């Protein structure tokens, strides 16, 4: 195991300065700080306090990374995980990345420093190549979001199929000008890409063309939904249906449509995703794709605890859970 002496030698910085960098001392030259950090990373150096944890007992703590704590999907998912963890004598640390690549890597560093025994990604911000090295420090399991580059356990739905079924419902209703909302395309997850592929395939199978103007990017929350509707209002050729990929975005569209000459669902049909509580409360009721959120959270945490309790090696496995189209008024 590397020591401060090794870091000092590799970086060409004195041991006392290395120590100040490790302890986040404010009076350290930035150039020296960068050299020390680079040497620590190259050597895989773990500070003494964390190294002691490495040699000692496990923390029985699991970090769960999400992107937006205010999203009801994540709160339901984490609640299910927490129930399983508590019953098994483990505790959960909730890490809210706010969509930041830097925050995600900071939280992931909890695994390297042995402050947690394992990490569950319910959202992914960085590319897998940046995350993969941390498998050397403990198990990582994916829940909800995923990437084809991994060979680790994953618990999710078939987003291609769910998107296909939602689009097919529009087509059966006679809709021909169908739009799509999707999230951030720069993320390391395949979720948004697979939804778009399922959407396009349904159109192709029924000989419908897709207008790129009806693809609304980076739409993830209520306000984004309002902005989507505002864009639709300004279009000369408008979509007659939009698959939003999010109940939050869908309710934003519906809310913004009130008082407009474009009515939901007569002029614009909408389908959400998740089946959050608001889907059954809003008027008109929101047609949406129901995800088995509780089951997904429970199975993910159960698998992580099984790995940790039995000290098992990670084996690539994908558990696909079933979705359901809930037809309401939109």
PLM features per residue range, with description:
Residues 1-60, 73:
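N-terminal helix-turn-helix DNA-binding module of bacterial transcription factors
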Residues 34, 46-110, 114-117, 196-200, ...:
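Amphipathic helical "hinge" segments at domain boundaries
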Residues 17-20, 54-70, 177-186:
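Short beta-strand segments enriched in small/hydrophobic residues
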């Amino acid at each position: 195991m590397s020591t401060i002496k090794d870091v000092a030698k590799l970086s060409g910085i004195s041991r006392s300065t290395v120590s100040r960098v490790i302890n986040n001392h404010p009076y350290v030259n930035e150039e020296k700080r960068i050299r020390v950090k680079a040497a620590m990373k190259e050597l895989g150096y773990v500070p003494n306090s964390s190294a002691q944890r490495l040699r000692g007992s496990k923390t029985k703590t699991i970090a769960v990374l999400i992107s937006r704590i205010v999203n009801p999907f994540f709160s339901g998912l984490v609640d299910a995980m927490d129930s399983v963890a508590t019953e098994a004598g483990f505790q959960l640390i909730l890490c809210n990345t706010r969509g930041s690549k830097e925050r995600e890597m900071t939280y992931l560093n909890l695994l390297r420093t042995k402050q947690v025994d394992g990490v569950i990604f319910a959202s992914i911000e960085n590319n897998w190549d940046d995350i993969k090295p941390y498998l050397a420090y403990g198990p990582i399991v994916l829940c909800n979001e995923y990437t084809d580059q991994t060979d680790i356990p994953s618990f999710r739905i078939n987003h291609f199929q769910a998107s296909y079924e939602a689009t097919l419902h529009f087509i059966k209703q006679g809709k021909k000008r169908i739009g799509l909302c999707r999230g951030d395309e720069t993320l390391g997850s395949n979720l948004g890409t697979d939804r778009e592929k399922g959407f396009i395939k349904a159109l192709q199978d029924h000989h419908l063309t897709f207008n790129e103007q009806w693809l609304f990017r980076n739409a993830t929350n209520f306000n984004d939904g309002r902005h989507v509707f505002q864009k639709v209002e300004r279009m000369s050729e408008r979509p007659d249906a939009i698959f939003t990929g999010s109940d939050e975005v869908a309710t934003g569209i519906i809310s913004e449509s009130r008082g407009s000459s474009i009515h939901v669902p007569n002029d614009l049909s909408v389908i959400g995703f998740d089946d959050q509580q608001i889907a059954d409360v809003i008027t008109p009721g929101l047609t949406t794709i129901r995800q088995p959120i509780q089951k997904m959270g429970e199975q993910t945490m159960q698998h992580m605890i099984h790995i940790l309790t039995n000290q098992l090696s990670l084996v690539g496995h994908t558990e696909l859970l079933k979705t359901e189209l809930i037809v309401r008024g939109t």
